[in-house]
Structures are given as structure tokens and as C-alpha cells.
Amino acid sequence: MKRFSCFFIWIFVLTSILPAQEREVKLKVVQTSDIHGNYYPYDFIRRREATGSLARVHALVQKEREAYGKNLILLDNGDILQGQPTAYYYNYIDTVAPHLAAEMMNFMGYNAGNMGNHDVETGRTVFDRWAGDCRFPILGANIVDTATGETHFETL
């Protein structure tokens, strides 16, 4: 057993001092921001098709994932919880179902997100529910709980 342990340690030391092989890795970072509740390519106010939406971003992300696979990093920079009637519905009417924004972002495979000023305006109950439904970290070192002085979301 002692010989085996010494051999294992020798192999570990030998492999840790050998130079690492150099190789090129390509990453693609896709970042969304200011979605403002435009989850679908439809303007519910004017009752007509709209040009932009999270659903259309998903089509782009799918193409990029084909090219980059797991080397695609998908991030959101906030301001997703206000703007269109669909957002308000999931913010204040249907408060039991998982939040639609979180469900779409989970489906799209977001790696991380953070809060925008308009997300904070929805109120703590809404943004806590959304963040709790997200299956990726919500970062926010500058969002501080005034009662405790602690950061409200993850910090790196």
C-alpha cells in the first residue's frame, strides 16, 4: 500500500510539473438586455406582429449553439420584468405559476443574469419569485438588503 501511495504521488508530481498543452478554445458570448417583457414577437398594445422578442433571440441562440456547443455563454443584463402586458400578467395576476420570463430563460439555457433598474421597480416579491424560478445564478453585488447590509443575490 505504501509503494502504491508513493507511486501515485510520484505520478501526480510528474504530471503537475509537465508543461500544459497549448490549444485554442473559441468562446461565444451572447448577451441580452432590456427585453422589457417582449417575450413574444407580438405587440399586445397595438395588436400586431413586433420585430423583436426573446423568442426571436432564441432562434439566434440555437444557431450559435450549433456552431459553438457548450462554448456559448448566454447572459442577461436585466430589465426583463416590465414593459408588455404578458410581463405584468406574470408579475401581478398569475403569481402561482412559474414566471414566464424565468421559464423562457431556463429553456434557452442562460448561464447567468442580473437585475436591471426596471426589474427592481417591480418590487421584491416579483423579482424574488422570478429569481427563484431561474435555474441559473442571478448576480447582483450592488443589490443590498438595507435591513441586514448583506447582498441580496450571489456575488463572485
Q: Each predicted region: which residue ranges?
A:
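Acidic, metal/ion-coordinating pockets
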Residues: A20-L156
